[in-house]
């Protein structure tokens, strides 16, 4: 198992991600396999020299089912770019499970956290977000007896609050599929996005549901990247109680539509965002 772990670390290094820890221990054999990494770090070889640091990372796999790995992390998680801290993630508890398929590749991931808080830098400003409970579930979509390149996702957040959206905490739930999302497992950054775009990758949003006080929003749709690397596609938004949101975004003319449930298509086409028939903004290229 030790040699397999070293091979995985070497494989990651070949992809430009370098894993290390100050003190690594292995125990539990022959009943289970336990790995503990104190002061874990992963550094990217990209131009920004991005680096993530974690106080402790532990993983356990039972000997009768080594394909299922249970992971526990002790924070904080600190992220750096160009030697500057850009994000700080803390939590009361954070647990994860990772399932490996017969080819020893990951095919299913679940992440569950309680009392999670995030501080991050955006355009020179510090922002804060928090959630009392969050879940992330990913899996390669099964097709018959095999696995496709599509990644299905489900995300939940309870008690979500942020400085950018003052007021009651929100409940968020979303499900969907990233077609050809497997490329993001083996590639990174612009290379992953461009490979995904050329493969005609698409994000299929089955449902995004946001509830916050008297406000309720449901979003469905499909998005991709066009030849100019700009977002293209359409999402349909329906909701109620959104008067304050429209006014804060300079769209007070739409607040009168709140007598009944609002239903509006957001169309991303030819480099522009359209709200129904109205051109709202010019879209930038993502890379």
Residue ranges of model-derived segments:
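Short, hydrophobic/aromatic-rich segments at coil-to-beta transitions
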Residues: 69, 107-110, 148-154, 200-207
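Alpha-helical transmembrane signal-anchor/signal-peptide segments
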Residues: 1-13
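Extended terminal
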Residues: 22, 191-198, 208-210, 224-229, ...
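Flexible, membrane-facing loop/turn or short amphipathic-helix motifs
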Residues: 41-49, 77-89, 116-129, 159-169, ...
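Extended lipid/amphipathic-ligand handling interfaces
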Residues: 23-27, 54-64, 90-104, 127-146, ...
């Amino acid at each position: 198992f030790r040699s397999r772990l070293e091979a995985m670390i070497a494989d990651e290094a070949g992809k430009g991600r370098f894993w290390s820890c100050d003190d690594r221990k292995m125990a539990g054999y022959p009943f289970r396999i336990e790995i503990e990494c104190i002061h874990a770090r992963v550094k990217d070889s990209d131009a920004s020299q991005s680096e993530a640091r974690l106080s402790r990372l532990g993983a356990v796999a039972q000997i009768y089912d080594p394909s299922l790995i249970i992971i526990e992390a002790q924070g904080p998680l600190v992220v750096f770019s160009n030697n500057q801290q850009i994000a700080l993630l803390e939590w009361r508890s954070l647990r994860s499970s990772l399932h490996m398929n017969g080819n020893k590749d990951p095919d299913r991931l679940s992440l569950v956290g309680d009392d999670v808080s995030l501080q991050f830098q955006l355009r020179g400003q510090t922002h804060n977000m928090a959630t009392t409970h969050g879940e992330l579930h990913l899996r390669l979509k099964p097709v018959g007896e095999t696995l496709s390149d599509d990644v299905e996702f489900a995300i939940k957040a309870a008690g979500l609050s942020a400085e950018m959206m003052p007021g009651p905490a929100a409940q968020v739930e979303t499900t969907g599929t990233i077609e050809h999302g497997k490329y993001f497992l083996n590639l990174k950054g612009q290379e992953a996005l461009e490979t995904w775009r050329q493969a005609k990758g698409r994000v299929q949003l089955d449902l995004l549901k946001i509830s916050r006080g008297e406000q309720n929003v449901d979003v469905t749709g499909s998005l991709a990247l066009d030849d100019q690397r700009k977002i293209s596609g359409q999402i349909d938004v329906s909701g109620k109680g959104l008067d304050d949101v429209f006014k804060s975004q300079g769209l007070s003319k739409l607040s009168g539509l709140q007598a009944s449930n609002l239903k509006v298509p957001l169309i991303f086409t030819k480099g522009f965002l359209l709200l129904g028939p109205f051109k709202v903004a010019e879209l930038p290229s993502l890379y």
